[in-house]
Amino acid sequence: MKIHVTGATGFLGSELLQLVPGATGERVEVRDEAAVHELFERLRPDVVIHTAYRQDGEGAREIVVEGAENVALAAVAVGARLVHLSTDVVFDGRKGGPYLEADEPSPCTEYGRAKADAEARVGKAAPDALIVRTSLIVGGPGHEPSKHELVARDPAMTFYDDEIRSPVQVGDLAAALLELAALDLSGLLNVAGADDVSRAELAELVGGRPVRRAPAPPGRPLDCSLDSSRARSLLRTQLRGVRSVFA
C-alpha cells in the first residue's frame, strides 16, 4: 500500500513517515490545484493522509479549506483513499459533554470555521473519504514535545481551567490513522485520547507542577471533548489518555 502524507514535516506528519518508511511526503502547495493533481498523478498513491494545515496567519483559511478540497479532488482522480484530519474545535464546546460524530459543527473561532468548511468540501469532493476529528496532539515522555507541551513548560503562562479537550499521543494517533487507512470506512470518526482534561490540567501533567489558572475569555471553545468509543471498537491501537501518557 503506497501512502502519501501531506504536511509531512509537521508533528503528526513526521510521525507517520517514521512509522511507514516507504511513505512519501513530498511537499506541494495545496492551494495550487494543478500542482496537487500533478503530484498525485506522478506518485499514484493508494492512500493519502491529509494532515497539512495552518491555524492562523496569512493564507490560513485558503490552506485549510481550498487545500483540503484540492487534495480530495486529486485523490479521487487517481483512485486513492483519503483520510482527512479535522479537529474538535469545529464545536463551540457548549453542548455540555463529549461530542459524537453525529453532532452538527458549531465553530466559534476562525480556525474552527475553516476546518468545518473543509469537512464539508471534502465530504462533497470525496464521498468515500474518512474524516477524522481529533484533539490536541502531544508527544509525552521520551518523545519530541509538541507546541502544547512547550507552552505548558513556561512558568509565566496562565492556563484555562474551563476549556476541556481530549488530548492524544502522537504515536497513538499515527498508528490509529494507519489502521483506519486499511479499513473500508467513510464519513466522520472521532479519534482522540481517553482522558478529557482542561488546558490547565494538561499543563500540570506536562510540567509536573501547579499552574496559574483562569477562565477562558469570551469567544473561546469550552468543553470540546470527543467521544471516541466508535474508534476504540474498531482499532487495535490503544488511544491512551494523557494522565497515563504523563504518569
Can you name each region flagged by the protein language model?
Residues 30-70, 76:
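NAD(P)H-binding glycine-rich loop region in Rossmannoid oxidoreductase-like domains
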Residues 62, 67, 90-132, 138-139:
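Catalytic helix-loop patch of NAD(P)-dependent Rossmann-fold dehydrogenases
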